[in-house]
Amino acid sequence: MIFCNCAVSGIVEANMTLMNNWSEDEKANYGKKVMVLQHRLAETGLFSDEALAGLLDRHPNHLIDFQHIPDNPDYPDQQVTVDFTGADGKTMINAAKSDGKIWINVREAMNRDPLYREILDQLHAELEMQTGRNKDRRNCRGGILISSAKASTPYHSDPTMTHLWHIRGHKKAWVYPRGQKFMPDEAYESIVLGEVDEDMPFDYALDQEAVVAPADLYGGELVLWPNRSPHRVENVTYCVSMVMEFSTKKSAFTNAGMFANGVLRRQFGLHPSWSEASAAEKVSK
């Protein structure tokens, strides 16, 4: 396998796996339970500050989200898009390492950049070996997240399957059950209907019943959770992570059903429940 210590020492060859072996329980629980596993992405050299600055320089600007979170108590989760025209990758990295609340999402970096694509392909191969499944995941979008020490991700639910590969820095992650107390149907319907992005109402009292509360991540962890599980993240230091997002037939089926329920609720005044619906009702939607 060929990895790149980008712009530092050129191309180096190394025969290495990127993930530790999974136990039989971990293989059986993939996609069913919250799990924290180990990986070695940092050892590729592709996620150093120097390598990431080079990636930012060559990645299409329209696929880079540079956001600042202002200190506004009335809108604590507000994100302001920053015009980074004229800024090079090193400047953006330095901004993320400043005292501000900075969030940089390098969208589809793992898919589009040849150096990172090679790593993504190997991850797919290793995940297939560990789980026996890969067809849907092969269509994933792989983005790289670069965020400041004060940045956080508010309580939300993803309509896609999500794999969080934490690579550098210290962050805390909370993952919650999927029941109505944590994720009411109406709140999730708002997500698939496009009424909101992915954020949901949150009360810190929910932390007492979180499945993971919290997981301290220091780099080298892969965090997995069942589709639609609410979660949130708080940085402690400057952080670098990679996120895989993809849909499966099951997640697409659920989203379509929740979309239909949202329409029935909003346009016809009905009160459908996805969790209590029979299999026949779910298929009919």
Residue positions per predicted region:
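Double-stranded beta-helix
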Residues: R168-L224, S229-P230
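Short, conserved beta-strand element in jelly-roll/cupin
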Residues: L145-S148, D158, T162-K172, P177, ...
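N-terminal auxiliary "cap/dimerization" subdomain that precedes the catalytic jelly-roll/cupin core
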Residues: I2-W103
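A short hydrophobic beta-strand segment most commonly corresponding to one strand
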Residues: T237-F253
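Conserved double-stranded beta-helix
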Residues: R112, D121-T162, A213-L217, T248-K285
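A short secondary-structure junction signal
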Residues: Y116-I119, T153-D158, W174-G179, M183-Y188, ...
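Hydrophobic alpha-helical hairpins/lids featuring a short glycine-rich hinge
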Residues: D99-D121
